[in-house]
């Protein structure tokens, strides 16, 4: 290589050193100093890994003093270059800048600059970059973007609600599905969509204290959303880091009690500028016109400051219209301001629901019924539609569906309230109860008597809670030596049951963690039964491992022993046998226990086994749950209401189970109340609301589309390619699972989302649902999204050289593959990616500027090419630099037309879609007051900003590949 003192060179292997200067030479070696980093490098004169930096007319360079020069002419004198041109800060012409005076902190960011500077990437990195651009652009444009990445079954009614609400501006809705239909999952899907699209960035979730960990686990395991749990301790710690502790995290979970207890804390929460507020168990927010509770007022303050709200409740509105109104009032206080007016409105919607029932029944409508429909949709001429709907002609069904759709748009609360019931959603198993009455051991009888004497001052409720768990009473007196499991007949029964059903998975739930741990030891030591334990003292990772062991078919645990709190948020549909070793105190917890198995997707009927001790609080509770509420074999929406009504009487029987006087009457009363309330619920079922919430065929089609996308293998090949290039080790674990671990030679030291000790992944939804230790990889998973960002935000793969062996073309023929990106810059919340994500446009130009891209498909062409090492590549580039410059100029001329077409198409689509949505809502505003003014204003503002941003869209060269034809 011809070196001269003062020449500027760049290192091929350490480009971060910047621009180097030749400072010493001898016969064999050259010393190059890199002023930007203060380092020297000694290279062999022959074959050193450095490239001469030479700029061309049209380039802009920076001097060491900071001013810039637009080059018009380049002269070489004694091996050194001098650039002449116009100085950009003063517009002075004919300014000369010698190469030794160039800024040393030079970074080559443009693909063509990197190519000419010898910074040539591996060929496979170029291919990965193009694929990453292509896939990322396609994913953003998918209509179900944000709905595929969660570790959940594809259940139509959940997808329908999430798809509807998740795309709204600052949604304010009440999710009121019955127990077991997945409100938490619906809320998670909505959050996931809003966060992924940029519509929301800061989220606050407020839940009862006992559900904090359930939400933490669900959000992380199902949606890869890493929330922070704020309690008194975390709040105090965060006060050292910020004036407002809640501004230290973007995603926060805290308890309702935590929010209510401190005025200062509530002020900090209100000032923290959340985008979305989620409140679970919203029926606990007690309200009356004259005396709202402190909890309600706290959430009301937050609701006034936070644009988007999701309220979750399982309590049907028929069991408390006033509290139902209170929840709607939180969503839109202007719309729901007067309870009496609300009651009257609800009664007026009855004809709407009846009309829908008539249409769906498919019967011919009477004149009165036709008149009712005309009155309900009075602002439009629907006579032709009614005529078709009431005929036997083709199109009658379609006409009926259109009328139902029109009625739904006019329905009172269908935009703010979603409610699915088990009657309206198919796919649930039956529940069969097996009670096992067992004798009360004398040891327990003695312990209970002594406890009664010593605990005489305890309240009836405390005594009742004690009496449910006699093993706890016994251990209080006997201490750690109290081996209750040696004589408790429930333990003998459990061991017998498990040994008789060795091949079947059994979930055992008990109230206390200590009971679960002791049972595991007994089962292991006495019968060699493999049992996993699951309790609140374990970390999330430990619980994952226990759940995964239970989920393994052949070598896994036969039994999972759960404590009450430990099992929250976990579902085990692959098991269908449930043993309740003891009973919970209230119907909600009972339903929660059964709900671990009784989910949509459960393939078998659920066998519920309840071994109980006679003449104890357990025997009282078994009868009350089963005979009074029918709560074991059916979901019990009436349970909490009846429990609140008979609470004190029930507590009395539980505290003194030997006193059975009047208990039969209590059970009879409860059953009558239960049956009456069920009839009331059934009669009050809002069929229209259920149809709207369920989504029907539209929801089914959405689920099928996502399922089809799940089967697409392009993600797997892309992910494997990505992991290879980033330097992540992959170890096939079998059962469609792969273990990823960091290597010593990664593209970046810490790959975001990959733990130090690695992780297990799967691309199969079914595997992810049964194996909680395996992460479910989709295009929306952080590992893939972070990988895409890593490749595309830097210059990885932006310039490369390949050889094409093709004897049909002359040796030395040049082709230049150019990847342009058309994009628009805008705030994330505008969700511009729906219309114009960063979109790659590929040109394949020959020396004459002919674009061959349409004839030469990328993947098949890529397979015909071979790589060139960096040193040879640099020599090739230097030899053909002038030709490459000429082809690049032709590329710039050709891209404008293609880019303009893309931008114009995106602008038309955005204008049509956003204008249509605005027009639809404005038309409905006249007949449905649940459409908020601020929502309409936001859509119009959004439309204007989107169109302005698209007008500013531009394009740039993102990557290029120089291809040279060879015959060898």
Curated annotation (Swiss-Prot):
Its EC number is 3.6.4.-. Residues 164-334 form the Helicase ATP-binding domain. GO terms for biological process: regulation of DNA-templated transcription. CDD domains: DEXDc_RapA, SF2_C_SNF. Residues 490-644 form the Helicase C-terminal domain. SUPFAM superfamilies: P-loop containing nucleoside triphosphate hydrolases (SSF52540). The keyword Disulfide bond does not apply. It is an enzyme of class 3 (hydrolase). InterPro entries: Helicase_ATP-bd, Helicase_C-like, Helicase_RapA, P-loop_NTPase, RapA_C, SNF2-like_sf, SNF2/RAD54-like_C, SNF2_N. Keywords: Activator, ATP-binding, DNA-binding, Helicase, Hydrolase, Nucleotide-binding, Transcription, Transcription regulation. It comes from the Bacteria. A motif (DEAH box) lies at residues 280-283. One of its GO terms (molecular function) is ATP binding. SMART domains: DEXDc (SM00487), HELICc (SM00490). ATP binds at residues 177-184. NCBIfam families: PRK04914.1. Belongs to the SNF2/RAD54 helicase family. RapA subfamily. Transcription regulator that activates transcription by stimulating RNA polymerase (RNAP) recycling in case of stress conditions such as supercoiled DNA or high salt concentrations. Probably acts by releasing the RNAP, when it is trapped or immobilized on tightly supercoiled DNA. Does not activate transcription on linear DNA. Probably not involved in DNA repair. Interacts with the RNAP. Has a higher affinity for the core RNAP than for the holoenzyme. Its ATPase activity is stimulated by binding to RNAP. HAMAP family: Helicase_RapA. PANTHER family: DNA ANNEALING HELICASE AND ENDONUCLEASE ZRANB3 FAMILY MEMBER (PTHR45766), SWI_SNF-RELATED MATRIX-ASSOCIATED ACTIN-DEPENDENT REGULATOR OF CHROMATIN SUBFAMILY A-LIKE PROTEIN 1 (PTHR45766:SF6). This is RNA polymerase-associated protein RapA. It comes from Enterobacter sp. (strain 638).
């Amino acid at each position: 290589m011809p070196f001269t003192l003062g020449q500027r060179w760049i290192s091929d292997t350490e480009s971060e050193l910047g621009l180097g200067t030749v400072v010493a030479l001898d016969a064999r070696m050259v010393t190059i100093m890199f002023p930007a980093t203060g380092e020297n490098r000694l290279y062999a004169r022959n074959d050193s890994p450095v490239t001469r930096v030479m700029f061309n007319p049209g380039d802009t360079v920076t001097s060491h003093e900071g001013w810039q020069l637009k080059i018009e002419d380049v002269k070489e004198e004694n091996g050194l270059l001098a650039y002449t041109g116009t100085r950009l800060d003063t517009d002075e012409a004919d300014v000369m800048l010698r190469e030794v005076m160039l800024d040393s902190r030079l970074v080559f960011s443009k693909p063509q600059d990197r190519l000419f500077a010898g910074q040539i990437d591996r060929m496979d990195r170029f291919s990965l970059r193009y694929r990453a651009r292509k896939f990322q652009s396609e994913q953003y444009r998918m209509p179900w973007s944000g709905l595929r990445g969660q570790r959940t079954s594809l259940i139509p009614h959940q997808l329908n609600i999430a798809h509807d609400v998740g795309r709204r501006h600052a949604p304010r809705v009440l999710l009121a599905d019955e127990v077991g239909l997945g409100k938490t999952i619906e809320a998670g899907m909505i959050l996931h969509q809003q966060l992924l699209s940029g519509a929301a960035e800061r989220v606050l979730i407020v839940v009862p204290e006992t559900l904090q960990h359930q939400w933490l686990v669900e959000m992380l395991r199902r949606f890869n959303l890493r929330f922070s749990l704020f309690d008194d301790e975390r709040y105090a710690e965060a006060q050292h880091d910020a004036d407002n502790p809640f501004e230290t995290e973007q995603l926060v979970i805290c308890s309702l009690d935590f929010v209510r207890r401190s005025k200062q804390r509530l002020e900090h929460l209100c000032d923290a500028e959340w985008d979305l507020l989620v409140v679970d168990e919203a029926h606990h927010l007690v309200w009356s016109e004259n005396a709202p509770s402190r909890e309600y007022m706290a959430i009301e303050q937050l609701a006034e400051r936070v644009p988007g709200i999701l309220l979750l409740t399982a309590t049907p509105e028929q069991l408390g219209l006033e509290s139902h109104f209170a929840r709607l009032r939180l969503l839109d206080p202007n719309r729901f301001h007067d309870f009496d007016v609300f009651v009257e409105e609800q009664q007026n919607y009855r004809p709407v629901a009846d009309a829908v029932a008539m249409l769906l029944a498919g019967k011919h409508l009477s004149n009165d019924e036709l008149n009712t429909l005309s009155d309900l949709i009075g602002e439009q001429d629907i006579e032709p539609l009614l005529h078709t709907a009431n005929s036997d002609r083709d199109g009658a069904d379609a006409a009926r569906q259109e009328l139902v759709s029109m009625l739904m748009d006019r329905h009172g609360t269908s935009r703010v309230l979603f409610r699915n019931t088990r009657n309206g959603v198919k796919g649930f198993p039956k529940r069969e109860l097996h009670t096992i009455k067992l004798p009360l051991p004398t040891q327990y009888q003695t312990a209970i008597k002594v406890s009664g004497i010593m605990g005489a001052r305890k309240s009836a409720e405390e005594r009742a809670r004690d009496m449910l768990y006699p093993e706890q009473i016994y251990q209080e007196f006997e201490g750690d030596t109290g081996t209750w499991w040696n004589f408790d007949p429930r333990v003998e029964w459990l061991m017998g049951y498990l040994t008789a059903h060795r091949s079947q998975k059994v979930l055992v739930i008990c109230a206390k963690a200590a009971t679960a741990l002791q049972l595991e030891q007994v089962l292991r030591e006495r019968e060699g039964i493999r049992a996993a334990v699951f309790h609140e003292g374990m970390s999330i990772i430990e619980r994952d491992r226990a759940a995964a062991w239970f989920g393994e078919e052949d070598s896994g645990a036969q039994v999972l022993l759960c404590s009450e709190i430990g099992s929250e948020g976990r579902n085990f549909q692959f098991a269908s046998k449930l043993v309740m070793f003891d009973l919970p105190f209230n119907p909600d917890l009972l339903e929660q226990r059964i709900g671990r198995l009784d989910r949509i997707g459960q393939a078998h009927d659920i066998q519920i086994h309840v071994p109980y001790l006679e003449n104890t609080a357990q025997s009282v509770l078994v009868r009350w749950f089963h005979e009074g509420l029918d709560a074991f074999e059916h979901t019990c929406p009436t349970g909490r209401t009846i429990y609140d009504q008979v609470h004190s009487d029930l507590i009395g029987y539980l505290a003194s189970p030997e006193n059975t006087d009047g208990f039969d009457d209590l059970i009879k009363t409860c059953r009558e109340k239960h049956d009456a309330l069920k009839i009331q619920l059934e009669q009050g079922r809002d069929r229209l609301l259920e149809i709207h919430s369920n989504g029907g065929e539209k929801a089914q089609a959405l689920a099928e589309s996502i399922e089809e996308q799940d089967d697409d293998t392009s993600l797997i090949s892309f992910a494997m390619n990505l992991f290879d290039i980033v330097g992540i080790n992959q170890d096939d674990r079998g059962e469609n699972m792969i273990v990823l671990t960091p290597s010593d030679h990664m593209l970046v030291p810490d790959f975001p989302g990959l733990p130090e000790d690695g992780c297990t992944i799967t691309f199969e939804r079914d595997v992810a649902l049964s194996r909680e230790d395996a992460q479910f990889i989709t295009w929306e998973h952080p590992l893939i999204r972070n990988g895409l960002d890593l490749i595309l935000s830097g210059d990885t793969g932006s310039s490369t050289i390949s050889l094409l062996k093709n004897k049909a073309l002359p040796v030395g023929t040049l082709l230049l593959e150019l990847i342009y990106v058309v994009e628009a810059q805008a705030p994330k919340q505008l969700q511009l990616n729906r219309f114009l994500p960063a979109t790659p446009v590929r040109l394949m130009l020959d020396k004459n500027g002919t674009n061959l891209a349409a004839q030469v498909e990328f993947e098949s062409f890529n397979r015909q090419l071979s790589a060139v090492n960096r040193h040879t590549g640099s020599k090739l580039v230097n030899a053909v630099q002038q030709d490459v410059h000429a082809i690049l100029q032709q590329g710039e001329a050709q891209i404008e037309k293609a880019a303009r077409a893309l931008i114009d198409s995106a602008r038309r689509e955005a204008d049509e879609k956003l204008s249509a949505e605005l027009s639809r809502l404005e038309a409905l505003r006249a007949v449905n007051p649940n459409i908020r003014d601020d929502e309409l204003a936001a859509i119009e503002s959004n439309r204007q900003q989107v169109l302005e941003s698209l007008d500013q869209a531009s394009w740039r060269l993102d990557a290029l590949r120089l291809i040279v034809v060879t015959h060898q």
